[in-house]
Regions:
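Switch/connector loops and helix/strand junctions flanking conserved nucleotide-binding motifs
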Residues: 71-73, 101-109
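Acidic, Ser/Thr-rich peripheral helices and adjacent loops at domain boundaries
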Residues: 114-117
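Short glycine-/small-residue-rich Rossmann-like dinucleotide-binding loops
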Residues: 66
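Conserved N-terminal substructure of TIR/SEFIR domains
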Residues: 1-63, 74, 83-91, 97
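Active-site phosphate/pyrophosphate- and oxyanion-stabilizing loops and adjacent acidic/basic residues
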Residues: 80
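Short alpha-helix boundary/capping motifs
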Residues: 56, 110-111
Length: 117
């Protein structure tokens, strides 16, 4: 599934994240860029963990960071798989939404706690 021309998008389903991802997906695909999203490309009864592990191997990864994303164990698993691969800073393009309260250190700790619980 992963090759040098794929762009993976990691996001929490629903709300503003989904709207933004739908727009990005349509725009990138109209330019001939293959976009991979779990909601569409995983398939019925697909192996979600195997699919998530592929995220880190894409040519580029767009991460739409929202409050919901930061509180989701599945999204955090995707982020860990992305981070396990080299050239992270050259291949990952974050989009931070307004509800993701990550700029205050105390609030970042709250996100860590919500995923670990």
């Amino acid at each position: 599934m992963a090759n040098n021309n794929n762009v993976f998008i990691s996001y929490a389903w629903g709300g503003e994240s989904e709207r933004i991802v739908n727009e990005l997906d349509a725009d990138l695909q109209s330019k001939g860029i293959l976009v991979i999203r779990d909601k569409r490309d995983l398939g019925f009864k697909g192996m979600i963990r195997d699919f998530m592990r592929q995220f880190g191997h894409g040519h580029a990864v767009i991460v739409v960071i929202s409050d919901k994303y930061l509180k989701s164990p599945n999204c955090m698993f995707e982020l860990v798989e992305i981070a396990r691969n080299k050239d992270l800073y050259d291949r990952v393009f974050p989009i931070v939404l307004g509800d993701a309260d990550i700029y205050d250190p105390v609030n970042r700790i709250k996100y860590i706690g919500s995923v670990l619980i």
